[in-house]
Amino acid sequence: MFTIKEEIANAITHGIGVLLSIPALVFLIIFAANYGSAWDIVSFTIFGVSMLLLYLSSTLLHSITHKKTKDILEIIDHSAIYVLIAGTYTPFLLGPLKGTLGFTLLVIVWSLALGGIVFKIFFVKRFILLSTFVYLVMGWLMIIAVKPLYASLSGAGFSLLFLGGILYSVGTIFYIWKKIPFHHAIWHSFVLGGSAAMFFCVLFYCVKVPFLS
């Protein structure tokens, strides 16, 4: 259970995410339309919508006190983490890694995401450590394709991708370390940082942007 102050901090941190995700989605679509293909438009949109879904569901969860509504939002919020992970993968797998490897990984991560969502529907308040472990495994599955990714993204793009992964991963420490005051808001802050790194990586390096060439 969170204190009132903690819930306010939880809502504010991801409320900021909602406000940033809306223009982020617009920029993603514009860049994909101007510099990418139809597949890039689809994949960038999926990524942007997955960010917005995560931050919106989280903000609502921490803002509403009605128990039944909160229980439903908790399922959506936890499920949205799986969606964000798979959504973040999508621009890379349909862009820089497109082909057999990209398609295979795409099927794997979205299958894991769907499995995770079904799991959360039934066990949202249980097996937290297991869920966190699955989040991390899904997130770092990309290491399978580290060589072609580095070749496609360049050093700067790959650094942003790696930074995003590190921020998300370090943040999970505070997600499960419940004895620290405001631990959940701290985790939210790491999620924001991870999303920012992934956003700029996708925006500038998953399509060929002329002014960075």
Curated annotation (Swiss-Prot):
Family: Belongs to the UPF0073 (Hly-III) family.
Membrane-protein topology: Multi-pass membrane protein
InterPro entries associated with the record: AdipoR/HlyIII-related, Hy-lIII
Protein name: Hemolysin-3 homolog
Subcellular location(s) per record: Cell membrane
Ranges that cross the membrane: 11-31, 41-61, 75-95, 103-123, 127-147, 157-177, 185-205
GO terms assigned for molecular function: pore-forming activity
Key words of the record: Cell membrane, Membrane, Transmembrane, Transmembrane helix
Major location category of this protein: membrane
Pfam families: HlyIII
Gene Ontology cellular component list: plasma membrane
